[in-house]
């Protein structure tokens, strides 16, 4: 009888050990899945923005006036990727992979002439913000990319934020604006600079390209 009791005791301990291991594996599996999904969404967001920007440039090729550009126009001419806009909705909201809004404005960054456009992405996390602002979106002048905005606006972007940029040599990081060039805060930012710049509010960061 004593032998049987001891055997039962060891069996219970072994079972608890197995359950603990299964629990650890389950938590690890969930964490790994969440990380993988986060990476997938971020990559998809970058793909969406790249496609949208390419479509805008192709639609306005040969033109130097973006004064009429807005979400409605881009939706109507089919420049918005299919997975960023739901035609069954009445709104003109363009949504990205993290379910935040994308808003496009004509840019007043070049001597008040609207010869460019600004694209804003809201409701992204600090980690996504860091990944985006450390990317090389195009340092070559031929790319058309001149500046980057990093903010923590909790409301929808209602107007372009990069009005203070008049040339690629300007430095306006105090206003959340970063430019290409050879200065210390030139974009793309370093990892350390990005970590300091992406100070997100609870609803997330806002990025402007």
Q: PLM features: what roles do these ranges have?
A:
Residues 10-19, 82-98:
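Phosphate-binding glycine-rich loops and adjacent basic patches that engage nucleotide phosphates
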Residues 31-71:
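Membrane-proximal N-terminal amphipathic helix
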Residues 2-41, 45-48:
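N-terminal single-pass transmembrane signal-anchor helix
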Residues 59-92:
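Short, glycine/small-hydrophobic-rich surface segments
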Residues 89-209:
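Intrinsically disordered, low-complexity regions enriched in Pro/Ser/Thr/Gly and acidic residues
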């Amino acid at each position: 009888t004593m032998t049987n009791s001891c055997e039962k005791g060891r069996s219970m301990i072994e079972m608890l050990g197995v359950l603990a291991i299964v629990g650890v594996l389950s938590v690890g599996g969930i964490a790994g899945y969440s990380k993988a999904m986060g990476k997938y969404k971020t990559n998809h967001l970058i793909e969406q923005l790249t496609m949208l920007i390419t479509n805008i440039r192709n639609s306005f090729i040969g033109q130097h006036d973006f004064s009429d550009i807005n979400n409605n126009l881009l939706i109507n001419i089919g420049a918005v990727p299919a997975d960023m806009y739901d035609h069954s909705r009445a709104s003109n909201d363009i949504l990205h992979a993290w379910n935040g809004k994308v808003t496009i404005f004509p840019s007043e960054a070049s001597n008040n002439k609207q010869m460019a456009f600004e694209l804003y992405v809201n409701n992204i996390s600090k980690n996504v913000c860091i990944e985006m602002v450390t990317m090389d979106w195009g340092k070559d002048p031929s790319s058309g990319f001149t500046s980057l905005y990093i903010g923590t606006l909790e409301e929808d972007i209602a107007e372009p934020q990069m009005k203070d940029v008049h040339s690629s040599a300007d430095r306006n990081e105090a206003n959340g604006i970063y430019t290409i060039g050879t200065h210390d805060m030139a974009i793309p930012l370093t990892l350390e600079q990005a970590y300091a710049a992406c100070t997100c509010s609870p609803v997330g960061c806002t990025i402007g390209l």
